Structures are given as C-alpha cells and as structure tokens.
Amino acid sequence: MARSDDADSRAARWEKEAHDLSTQVAFLQEELALVRRKLTESPRQVRQLEERLAAAQAQLARLTENNERLVSTLKEARAQIVTLKEEIDRLAQPPSGYGVFLARHDDGTVDVFTGGRKLRVAVSPSLEVADLRRGQEVLLNDALNIVDAFGYERAGEVVMLKEVLAGPDGAPGDRALVVSHSDEERVVHLAETLIDAPIRAGDSLMIEPRSAYAYERIPKSEVEELVLEEVPDVDYTDIGGLHAQIEQIRDAVELPFLHADLFREHQLRPPKGILLYGPPGCGKTLIAKAVANSLAKKIAERRGEEKHTSYFLNIKGPELLNKYVGETERHIRLVFQRAREKAGEGTPVIVFFDEMDSVFRTRGSGVSSDVENTIVPQLLSEIDGVEGLENVIVIGASNREDMIDPAILRPGRLDVKIKIERPDAEAAKDIFSKYILPGLPLHPDDLAEHDSDPQATVAAMIDAVVLRMYSETEENRFLEVTYANGDKDVLYFKDFNSGAMIQNIVDRGKKMAIKEFLTSARKGMRLQHLLDACVDEFRENEDLPNTTNPDDWARISGKKGERIVYIRTLVSGGKGADAGRSIETASNTGQYL
C-alpha cells in the first residue's frame, strides 16, 4: 500500500514535470518561431532604420542651414538697429554752427566770429589751441564751444588791394585796405595764409565780408585784365618794307638804353615816348613788339647774359574806360605801377597804347561826355613821372593822330613821331618775301619755267603779283574823290594796300593751292593762285563803309590833305555793284581799307 502511494505520487510528480517540460517545450518552440520570424524580418527593419537615419540627417542639414541663415539675418538686423540708433541719435542732436577763429588767450579760451557776433568760447580737450590759425574755420557745438577745426574759406567776394596797413612797429601788419567793385573802401584782416604772401597794391583778394577776413590772392590782378604782359618773339627781320621807320625807332629807343653814359655826357635827355601813326594794317603793333624784343637782346649782349627778357604791356584801350568816376584814372595808375615794378628788375618795359585816339581824345571834343578831361591829365602825369625811371618807354599807335590831345603829342612826352606809310612796290616785294618762301610747295609748271630753282620761282611770282597790284591800269581803278575846291583825283587799289592785305592775299593763294591739290592731285602753289587771290581781295574791298562823312573815312585810310566832300567807286562788274555809286548811297558795307 505504501509502495503504491509512493508510486502514485512519483507518477503524479513525473506527470507534472512532463507537463511542465511540455509547456516549456511549447514556449521554447514559440520563442524559436518568433526568433526565426525576427531573423527573417531583420534586414527589412535595418533598411527602414537606415532610410529613417538618412532622412533624419537630411532634415538636420536643412535645419542647420536655416539656423545659420537666421543667425546671419539676426546679426544684420542687430547691425541695422545699431546704425539706425546712431542715425536717430545724430538726427536728434542740436545743430552745430560754424565760426571763424580770431585770437587765443592765456586762460585757454579763444575768440571766434559767428552769427554776426564776436564770442569768447572754450576749446574741446581733443584740440590743441596752439594749432588754431587766424581766419581758420571752426565747428561749434550747441554750447558754442569749439569741437573741430577745418581749413580756410574758399568762396567770397573779390576786391582790389589798395595797401597793406603797417603794424605798431612800422612793419607790414595783419590788416589791409581794400576797394570793392562799388568803390567802397574797407579795412580787413589778413588770414595767416596771406601774412607772408607776396601781395601788392592792385592784386585781387578774396574776402569773406561778414568776418572781414582776406583769405586768398586771386592770381589775375586787376591790371592784368587791361594789359597783355608777354615776352615778344617778333624780330625786326620779321617786318618787311619799313626799313626807314625801323631805323628811326632804333635811334629813338635803343641808343638811349644802350649808350646811357653818352647821353648823360652830352646832356641829352632820352625820349619818353613814341607815336606810331599811319593807316591800319601797316605794322604799327608789329614794330612795337619788335622794339621790346630787340632791346632785350641788346641789353643781354652787353651784360653777357644768354637769356634775354623783356615785357610788352599791350594796353587794351577801350577796356580802360569804366562807368564809375575815377576808375579809368586808377587803371592808368595801375598800368604804370606795373611798368615801374618790371623796370625795377632791370628789364626793358614797353608800355604800348594801341588805338590811342579811342581813349586819349582831344579834351572838349566829346559829344555826350567829357571823360577825356580827366583821363588825359592822368596819362600826362604818368608820362612825366616816367622821366626818372630806367628801362621804360611809352609807345602809342593810332590811325587818327589828329584826334589825340595835343598835350600828349608835344615834345617832352611823346617826343618821337614816326609815320608808318602804306607800302610802295619795293616795300610790297619785301613783305611778300616774308610770306612766300622757297620752302613752300611750288607747282611743277612754275618751277619748270625757272630751271627748277625755287628761289628764282618765288622771286618771279612776287614780281608778277606786285606788278599786278601796283599797275595803274583800268582794272585797278578804285575811287574818284572830289575835294572841297572842286578838284578830282583817281585812286587805285595800290593806294590802299597794306601789309595785312598782302598777308591776306598770300593766305588766299595758299588756300587755293590746297583746294586744287584736293581736286586734281597736283600739288604746289602757282602764280595764278596769287593773281586770283589779288583779284578776290580787291573785289571784297570794293564796297566802302556806309558813312556820310567821306573826309573822316579818308583820314582813317591815310588820305589826308584837302578835305574830301564826295567819293564814287570806279569798279565795275564786281559783286553786282554799279559803277559811279557815291559813298552816301552805298547799301553794302565792308572793312576799312
């Protein structure tokens, strides 16, 4: 019985253990199936995880880029905010004023001129008071303290310096007396830029009227507006047909300058001035320029100098006149003051008044004004003042010397009077030789007629064209003049010839040669070109000026003597003009001959 119970219990235990083992086997089988299934699904999951990882990395890169862009935008926005804040702060600041520095004081304060007031203000610690200069522009804050310094004023009013006022010790000071365009005088301070500058009376200065400071010397002085100051390069050899006149002017000008000791020994006073008179275009201005050049060369040779210097002050006569009373006289004084300064340097100075009759007319001859009543005496006093000066001579030129005030022409002022005549045939040849040179392109046909000798060809061309100009033939008849006594006279084109007309004829001939070369490819100037140019020049001058006073016109043209009361032209076939027209009825006007 006991064994049976024990067997039953063992059987039950074994059965239970078998059941447990069966359960475990079933569980393990399920686990094994699950493991097998997982092993089967594992590669697919790996691929999915890899895909998710790649997507996450791409999203991370995008987020990183966006983050960097946002950071950059944030930095830019922060910088813009700072800039805008600075701009707002700057716009919110009170306005700063400008002033002019006047003087410094021992206590560190300075005087400035601003807003029409003179103030004593402090200077910012960032600036050195010792570095501030009189007349300098400074910046003032809202408390009117200097916070910055700049340069000098660059714009203002132009005035004429009359004189630099002396300081307490008698030396040139820091103030000047100036004259405005309205002839108003005022005293101004000189900025430090002008304290040591070489300024003189007559210079133009730029001032700032409110602060009364002069800042800058304008390079062109007032007197330079009236004269042409130059070193002439014209020589006597450049002038043709005036040998006698050149000899006269050499005796009058060069001898006193080059042999001053002989003049003093003989107690001979050198001439103060020369008057060159004659018809227009005959070389008066050219001679005056040659005088200055020749005189400078001679003086340089005597001194043993290689470089020669001379000054030719060519006065623009009509520009001397000014509507304000006394201005014309002041201009004349400035001209002679400049001449004295240049002469003081030891160089010859020629003061040349061209068209002298336009300014220095006979006193009392004015129709509507009496301006010459004060201008002429001013010139007379200046010419008399030249007596004690060295290297200065006055030369006047005019084609109406009868209209110049007699006090100017009397001995002791314009001592030497030289008439510049119209060129005769020989003088015309000499003038032509200055413009027609063997080196010019000459036509082969003309050269062939003279054995290809350029010199002979040029000489023959000049002889032929002068013969054409000066022959008293029917085609050269120009005018018939009637004098007050009833006499009549026939004038030819040669009677109105001049050096300027000869130059114009040569220029016309050269132009014709150029035009022929461009059309026919045959190069060189021919005699026919000059003859045609001569005809064209005469034809252009056949219409006289439309004046009702033929006697005045004749005087300007150089025909003086018996008074002319009537003029009629004798030219036919030119420009459609009818022969026999009187000057009073001429419809077309031309130039003075």
UniProtKB/Swiss-Prot annotation:
Source domain of life: Bacteria
Associated pathway: Protein degradation; proteasomal Pup-dependent pathway
Record key words, sorted: ATP-binding, Chaperone, Coiled coil, Nucleotide-binding, Proteasome
UniProt KW ATP-binding keyword: yes
UniProt feature coiled coil, ranges: 5-94
InterPro entries: AAA+_ATPase (IPR003593), AAA_ATPase_domain (IPR050168), ATPase_AAA_core (IPR003959), ATPase_AAA_CS (IPR003960), NA-bd_OB-fold (IPR012340), P-loop_NTPase (IPR027417), Prot_ATP_ID_OB_2nd (IPR032501), Prot_ATP_ID_OB_N (IPR041626)
Region Disordered, annotated ranges: 574-593
GO MF annotations in UniProt: ATP binding; ATP hydrolysis activity
GO cellular component: proteasome complex
Annotated residues for binding of ATP: G281, C282, G283, K284, T285, L286
Pfam families in UniProt: AAA (PF00004), Prot_ATP_ID_OB_C (PF16450), Prot_ATP_ID_OB_N (PF17758)
Docks into pockets in the proteasome alpha-ring: annotated segments: 592-593
Subunit-level organization: Homohexamer. Assembles into a hexameric ring structure that caps the 20S proteasome core. Strongly interacts with the prokaryotic ubiquitin-like protein Pup through a hydrophobic interface; the interacting region of ARC lies in its N-terminal coiled-coil domain. There is one Pup binding site per ARC hexamer ring. Upon ATP-binding, the C-terminus of ARC interacts with the alpha-rings of the proteasome core, possibly by binding to the intersubunit pockets.
Comment field on protein domains: Consists of three main regions, an N-terminal coiled-coil domain that binds to protein Pup and functions as a docking station, an interdomain involved in ARC hexamerization, and a C-terminal ATPase domain of the AAA type.
Name this protein carries in UniProt: Proteasome-associated ATPase
